[in-house]
Amino acid sequence: MSITMSDSAAQRVQAFMNNRGKGLGLRLGVRTSGCSGMAYVLEFVDDMNDDDIVFENKGVKVIIDGKSLVYLDGTELDFVKEGLNEGFKFNNPNVSSECGCGESFNV
């Protein structure tokens, strides 16, 4: 089981963590949402939960709850710039379909 991140994603997360000044790492999870069923959740972690699993990659701790790991195993977190837009992109090999707007997915 693994979660990885690109160099650009690691640099961006580290910059956010440094600006924030505290935190253990970044939580990656899923929630029920959108027309395809699930959406990604990214948030800072200050306290660990009992079922959390930690993946450290490029100096960044990515923290995932046990229930989300089933949907996220093998995912690479990337940070991309396209024109004036920039943001995190999830390269998830488990995704079977995505909604037209790209906000949600199904496995």
From Swiss-Prot:
Keywords: Iron, Metal-binding. Its cofactor is Fe cation. Gene3D superfamilies: HesB-like domain. InterPro entries: Fe-S_cluster_asmbl/transfer, FeS_biogenesis, FeS_cluster_insertion, FeS_cluster_insertion_CS, HesB-like_dom_sf, IscA_proteobacteria. Binds 2 iron ions per dimer. The dimer may bind additional iron ions. One of its GO terms (molecular function) is iron ion binding. Signal peptide: none annotated. GO terms for cellular component: cytosol. The keyword Metal-binding applies. This is Iron-binding protein IscA. The lineage of its organism: Bacteria, Pseudomonadati, Pseudomonadota, Gammaproteobacteria, Enterobacterales.
